Amino acid sequence: MGGWSSKPRKGMGTNLSVPNPLGFFPDHQLDPAFKANSENPDWDLNPHKDNWPDANKVGVGAFGPGFTPPHGGLLGWSPQAQGLLTTVPAAPPPASTNRQSGRQPTPFSPPLRDTHPQAMQWNSTTFLQTLQDSRVRALYLPAGGSSSGTVSPAQNTVSAISSISSKTGDPVPNMENIASGLLGHLLVLQAGFFSLTKILTIPQSLDSWWTSLNFLGGTPACPGQNSQSQISSHSPTCCPPICPGYRWMCLRRFIIFLCILLLCLIFLLVLLDYQGMLPVCPLTPGSTTTSTGPCKTCTTPAQGTSMFPSCCCTKPTDGNCTCIPIPSSWAFAKYLWGWASVRFSWLSLLVPFVQWFVGLSPTVWLSVIWMMWFWGPSLYNILRPFMPLLPTFFCLWVYI
């Protein structure tokens, strides 16, 4: 075994013309050492072998349709011998010489307003009559599974219109509206974040203004620094925690936060009172008490016309309601004054003084003019920290 010999051999494997696909017979070298490589594809060196020309053809064999058993070894070398399925593309049909034959493209249907202008009159009887036409009804009620496009006439007009309404589904969401809505939310979020950053600077600005009152005409400096604390010179509004003035800075900012919350609360109460949600009623003329009882309607109408909300008050004697048009600020001031007078009795002693001060109108006006003249140059610096709150209050006043 191992090479080819010209001497006749006897025994098993002497018929060298028999195909030897698995290499179990002599003189058929399968090992790559015997030139079974890609450089010598015809590695079966037997010159008397049967070339098995039919093996190169694709046919039906034991490996299924389109496969050919391997020849010359375990897999063979040609694509057909390796058992690969070779797909032969089918020849395309000949091109038609008559371009007019076959199905023609469907032409575009003209709009309804051009073919049936009377159908566009929805509020007239002409449309109801036109709807009986099968061609018009086919535009609204297409026949399912029918290629003719004709529809049996409706029994009545009401059922046809109801069928039209029943086939109308939910409207498709408009992407432009969705995008504009998202953009609006993003703008509101950006404006809110900008306002928040500005509002957070209010305590520091007010703290600077507060400390500047103690250093009129000079540069504010922290009085808590000394030679023993080993702290460099700094502003009293930026004291480090180890500075003795740090606790005073925290106290000032806490008071400022309370004042801001009180301002927001006052604005909210004024807004609720303006909307009529606050049960605040002034004293009814000629009476000493007032209440907001279960009276639903006013028996005595309000005198005159006023854009301010009316306050409906009841008299404990007869239970009649009296509507008095009052401004919200006046009602709110009366509410705060009544609430404070109950808890602080000493406020009643200030009433004569306030009445006397209000009666001196020339003096009051002169005092206001003098204060504006004195505080005028620095009035903007005083009110500047409250500027971010003004748009917020305005939006709440308009939209609530």
Curated annotation (Swiss-Prot):
Q: Which residues lie on this side of the membrane: Intravirion?
A: 2-253, 203-253, 370-375
Q: Where is the lipid attached (N-myristoyl glycine)?
A: 2
Output compositional bias ranges, type Polar residues: 96-106
A Pfam family for this UniProt protein? vMSA
**What's the protein called, per UniProt?**
Large envelope protein
Query: Membrane spanning segments where?
Result: 182-202, 254-274, 349-369, 376-398
**PTMs per UniProt:** Isoform M is N-terminally acetylated by host at a ratio of 90%, and N-glycosylated by host at the pre-S2 region.
Location of the region described as Disordered in the Swiss-Prot/TrEMBL record = 1-24, 86-114
Q: What is known of its domains?
A: The large envelope protein is synthesized with the pre-S region at the cytosolic side of the endoplasmic reticulum and, hence will be within the virion after budding. Therefore the pre-S region is not N-glycosylated. Later a post-translational translocation of N-terminal pre-S and TM1 domains occur in about 50% of proteins at the virion surface. These molecules change their topology by an unknown mechanism, resulting in exposure of pre-S region at virion surface.
Region (Pre-S), start-end ranges: 2-174
Classification of source organism: Viruses, Riboviria, Pararnavirae, Artverviricota, Revtraviricetes
Listed A to Z, the keywords are: Acetylation, Caveolin-mediated endocytosis of virus by host, Fusion of virus membrane with host endosomal membrane, Fusion of virus membrane with host membrane, Glycoprotein, Host-virus interaction, Lipoprotein, Membrane, Myristate, Transmembrane, Transmembrane helix, Viral attachment to host cell, Viral envelope protein, Viral penetration into host cytoplasm, Virion, Virus endocytosis by host, Virus entry into host cell
